[in-house]
């Protein structure tokens, strides 16, 4: 599990969106399993077995008017087709049932609108959406934001289990306890630049914050330069 730490404005999300193909980039390379890959759009990322759980699940994650089944299956429609146009409803229901049990999603029916679920269950549905594609790299941007303590623990367990299965987890978190408790290695950013790496066993609030504020200008120094 690799964490991307930094203060608001460090551009951690922008970096991950660039890797996933949501943002254009003019420099840098992406390597997966020792091979350079070229990602210009999300479809390229998905083909290279990369998934992205976005920061704001309501704005860019869930499709609120659609059902839980639709939200889980939307990223893997090619595998769920029955012919060139039709979808295989049986496969979709099997996919939903498997993930409902695996992720402990509390939902009365696959046809339930996702907007009626709790924040924690919505987040688990979104994780299930990407796991249906069996990604090798899973980018999680603020995976426990806005959910209760019980749901946080469940998602921590899911993340830990995915790491045990050999998935590469890249996590962005603004919670210091989450960064220190979950990460094997922490990359710290400040003002769009990487300021350092810290092994998980050595990560403390003090050394993370020192790197996260490395390029910040003191108010008095900024005033003197005006």
Annotate each language-model stretch with its function.
Residues 1-226:
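Glycine-rich phosphate-binding loops of nucleotide-dependent enzymes
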């Amino acid at each position: 599990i690799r964490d991307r730490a930094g203060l608001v404005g460090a551009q951690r999300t922008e970096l991950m969106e660039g890797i996933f193909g949501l943002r254009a980039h003019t420099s840098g390379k992406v390597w997966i399993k020792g091979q350079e890959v070229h990602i210009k759009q999300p479809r390229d990322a998905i083909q290279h077995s990369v998934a992205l759980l976005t920061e704001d699940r309501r704005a860019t994650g869930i499709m609120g008017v659609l059902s839980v089944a639709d939200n889980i299956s939307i990223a893997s429609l090619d595998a769920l087709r029955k012919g060139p146009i039709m979808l295989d409803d049986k496969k979709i229901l099997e996919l939903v049932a498997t993930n409902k049990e695996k992720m402990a999603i509390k939902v009365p029916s696959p046809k339930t609108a996702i907007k009626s679920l709790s924040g924690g269950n919505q987040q688990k549905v979104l994780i299930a959406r990407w796991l249906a594609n069996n990604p090798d790299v899973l980018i999680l941007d603020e995976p426990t934001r806005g959910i209760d303590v019980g749901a946080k623990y469940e998602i921590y367990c899911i993340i830990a289990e995915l790491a045990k299965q050999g998935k590469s987890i890249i996590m962005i978190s603004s919670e210091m306890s989450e960064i220190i408790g979950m990460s094997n290695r922490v990359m710290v950013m400040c003002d769009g630049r990487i300021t350092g790496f810290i092994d998980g066993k050595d990560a403390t609030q003090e050394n993370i914050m020192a790197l996260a504020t490395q390029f910040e200008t003191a108010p008095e120094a900024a005033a003197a330069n005006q």
